Amino acid sequence: MKHFNQIFTQRRIFWIFSGIMLVPNIFLCFTEQLPLLFKVSYILIPGALYLLLLILSRKPGITFWALFPLHFIGAFQLVLLYLFGNSIIASDMFLNMFTTNSGEAFELLDKLAPAVVGVFLLYLPALALAVYSIRRTETLTPLFQKRVFMLAMLMIGSGILVYTPAHRKYPHTARLDNLYPINAFNNARFAVDSWEAAKNYPRTSRKFDYRATSTRDTELPEIYIFVIGETSRAGNWGLYGYERNTTPKLDAMPDVIHFDDVLTQINATHKSVPLMLCPADALNYNEIYRQKSLISAFKQAGFHTSFLSNQLRNGSFTEFFADEADCTIYFAAPKNKPHLHDDVLLSAVDSLLNIGKTKQLIILHTYGSHFNYCERYDTDCRIFTPDHIKEIDHKNKQAMINAYDNSIVATDKFLAQVIDKLDRTGKTSAMLYLSDHGEDLLDDERNRFLHASPIPTYYQLHIPFVIWFSDNYSTLFPDDIRQARNRHTTPFDSRVVFLSLIHISE
């Protein structure tokens, strides 16, 4: 212990803490496309601020523990760099922390072992060392604090000196608010403000009114089912030309129309799904705080509305919109199972189709292809093997793709069953399917994985959009079918589903 005390003096602990706090800045200098001079400022100015904070107490461990929120964000930033390869923590990533349930989080973290172990090894010993620093009777001397203060001032002066020409040449990139951790805390503040605004949604949207009416015969039976997909990218659908026939059932249905060029507006579920269901769009997202969903429009037009979800409540706009429905059901998995498969929704669909309502809108929010992929399907959809991975790594890429493709097979089976149920009613009906976003699967040299990255890839944006119309609908409204087929190659974004649902039921 005496030898330990001699090695870990308060001064050495001080410099260890300074280095640890700088680690995210150092990594970001390598991952971000920043001007060279600004990279110097990226180290000097935050580094000086860390020094100034650490000399606030003569025991650096006290300050280090007081800065725990900074270390938490630093650990989060390092994990995201491992996952996405670049970019500062975006506000949507902070919102994902609020809206992602613990089961999903543990499924992912379990496969990110290198990153998680790395941040634990970096921060946990440091926090333990901070406790040791607090308990030691030795303190930093006033002379040491004075010298560190002078060093910090020199670093700030040098940082500003090189910042000025960098900012003059690159005014949009080389900005003080682009320095870590200032940018991360700004994004965190924006996320908290957005979360608070969402909580006020029932009040801010109370007066919204579609004034919707139906132009069709009130006695005409109509049933429309909108299936919200999860993490399904068009590139892995056989229907879209994928080398594997992952959609054999939909391929065999001549009445199924798929749209080739549809992009999601946002690559994160907590925003992309609400934007499917209301008139707001990504460029005018704040409009969502004052709007209600298409569920309210259908209710005003005389439809019985239902929202069935295989996902958990999470306090997002999806939950607010779901509660507008006449019938809202969330399916909870038993304790010994991580998540129910989507076919749990089918029995509820059967019940709704038999309640005797003339006009119905049914929305099914599936779990689709959400990671961990191999847990999203039964054995009869386990076509491609091996399909289990222990960690996210390039050597496991094929097994990961196999599992993902099997989840698409399960989606194909599910949609075919929904179509069959609608077809058997003999009523005027349609089924629309649109995924919320796609997914990265270590596709190229960037080795990107998952979705919701601050800079999305095409794999995250290109999503499948599929429509099926019943024979009765085709007979009554042939122009709609003709128009859909003629426009199946037209570029759309995910707003198309809101407009399509309103149009086919008007």
Which residues does each predicted region cover?
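Non-catalytic, well-ordered alpha-helical segments in soluble enzyme domains
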Residues: 299, 473, 478-505
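Metal-dependent active-site segment of extracytoplasmic phospho-/sulfohydrolases and closely related
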Residues: 225-226, 407-450, 498-501
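Histidine-centered active-site microenvironments of extracellular/periplasmic hydrolases
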Residues: 241-245, 427-428, 434-477
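Active-site-proximal alpha/beta segments of enzymes that process anionic O-linked groups
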Residues: 157-226, 231-391, 499-501, 505
